[in-house]
Curated annotation (Swiss-Prot):
Binding of substrate, residues: 38, 60-62, 92-101, 218, 236
Species: Candida tropicalis (Yeast)
Gene that this polypeptide is encoded by: URA3
Secretion signal, residue range per the UniProt entry: none
Enzyme Commission number(s) of this protein: 4.1.1.23
Record-given protein name: Orotidine 5'-phosphate decarboxylase
Any one GO BP annotation for this protein: 'de novo' pyrimidine nucleobase biosynthetic process
Record's catalysed reaction(s): orotidine 5'-phosphate + H(+) = UMP + CO2
Length: 268
């Protein structure tokens, strides 16, 4: 059953400080749009985020794509933009290893993800040890609240993340009610009857395109929100060839917000 409560109502009783902040931010900015910024240079990365910042609740990064990455030159300006435009940061790292390894990948190395990313995500293939390792890493390296999304379903054609895999991933998510805040999925993942309020973030959302040559499949904003999505993740639809990021940012924000209002019965 799809959750029809408002973001404010959900924020008021959610056990996670990350989820509380995200819901409050979404309500205050009237947006459920996450911008996925996959570009190879820091200059383009920061420029796009600055343009899209007013329209988004979250920016999703693949930080290892950036060829000229440096903590001082890439991450510190990103943090400043997040303060300027009031959005949160989600590093789409898709951790998939044993607990100690993911802890080190999360906290150490070049990227030091736990120090700057509010939210990250993980596959369920290694069981709940991965969740425990990431939680321990967050606790040891930052006083800021951190949240984890589990990858329950993917938007790519031929994905193996469905059926029993999805069900097992949901069980892993139940192991930590505060740290695991939700899923990357295509629909509501349930859990309401057991007291879970998982945030559903959905990639592969498009107002114009149906797919690409590399197996991506797109669904409409209204379609995904009506089946339980809380946050729509949009990438090339915002800044692809011939698109104006500010025009598209406003367009997707309005589409996502109106779909949310319809779901909650606030808009006919």
């Amino acid at each position: 059953m799809v959750n029809t409560e408002t973001y404010t109502e959900r924020a008021s009783k959610h056990p996670s400080k990350v989820a509380q902040r995200l819901f409050q931010l979404m309500e205050s900015k009237k947006t459920n749009l996450c911008a996925s910024i996959d570009v190879p240079t820091t200059k383009e990365f920061l420029s796009l985020i600055d343009k899209l910042g007013p329209f988004i609740c979250l920016v999703k990064t693949h930080i290892d794509i950036i060829s000229d990455f440096s903590y001082e030159g890439t991450i510190l300006p990103l943090i400043e933009l997040s303060k300027k435009h009031n959005f949160m940061i989600f590093e789409d790292r898709k951790f998939a290893d044993i607990g100690n390894t993911v802890k080190l990948q999360y906290t150490s190395g070049v990227y030091k993800i736990s120090s700057w990313s509010d939210i990250t995500n993980a596959h369920g293939v290694t069981g709940k040890g991965g969740v425990e390792g990431l939680k321990k890493g967050a606790d040891e390296t930052t006083n800021e609240p951190r949240g984890l999304l589990m990858l329950a379903e993917l938007s790519s054609k031929g994905s193996l993340a469905y059926g029993e895999y999805t069900n097992k991933t949901i069980e892993i998510a139940k192991s930590d009610k505060e740290f695991v805040i939700g899923f990357i999925a295509q629909r509501d993942m349930g859990g309401h009857d057991q007291g879970f309020d998982w945030i559903i973030m959905t990639p592969g959302v498009g107002l114009d395109d149906k797919g690409d040559a590399l197996g991506q499949q797109y669904r409409t904003v209204d379609e995904v929100i009506s089946t339980g999505t809380d946050v729509i993740i949009v990438g090339r639809g915002l800044f692809g060839k011939g698109r104006d990021p500010e025009v598209e940012g406003k367009r997707y924000r309005e589409a996502g917000w109106n779909a949310y209002l319809k779901k909650n019965g606030q808009l006919e």
